[in-house]
């Protein structure tokens, strides 16, 4: 089943801050296996498949007529990148920061000496974790399948997972009866 969100980050789009994305995912047996997230303003493309891994391509405006997956992969950076950081990075929603998220961040600050908080919009947050620029993205507010499926596929292909907040160690599932 294909899951498409043609404008993820509607609030960010309206605010004109550039933090909106186009998300496309392929889900098989409830698990996202292919994901594509495009950031039109930044001209960045994140893409992944369980067979090929996760990648980021910067500076993309259009695809050439002879573009192939091999050419895209060759021009891209494999995720996660090996980024050396001296702090624990939490990425949180710019528009959906809840008291539960704030409590989670406070708990992280008790565990780690240096904590940096990055606020971002839309599925960019999942991409930042998959890329290795952030350690965790806590989200306790309700979300829809089209908000997470593409990013989830990218995270999985980068060796990470997205779990249900109320059921620790249970990955998100897709194509459920109740959205």
Show where each model-derived region lies:
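Short loop->beta-strand "edge-of-pocket" segments that line small-molecule binding or catalytic clefts
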Residues: 73-101, 107, 111-120
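Short clusters of hydrophobic/aromatic residues that line enzyme substrate/ligand-binding pockets
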Residues: 54, 79, 172-174
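Short, hydrophobic/aromatic-rich segments at coil-to-beta transitions
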Residues: 32-36, 87-89, 134
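DPxDG-like acidic metal-binding loop motif
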Residues: 1-59, 66
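Buried hydrophobic positions in well-ordered alpha/beta secondary-structure cores of metabolic enzymes
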Residues: 9-10, 90, 129
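Residues at the C-termini of beta-strands that transition into short coil/loop
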Residues: 49, 58, 83, 94, ...
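Oxyanion/phosphate-interacting regions
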Residues: 66, 70-72, 102-111, 118, ...
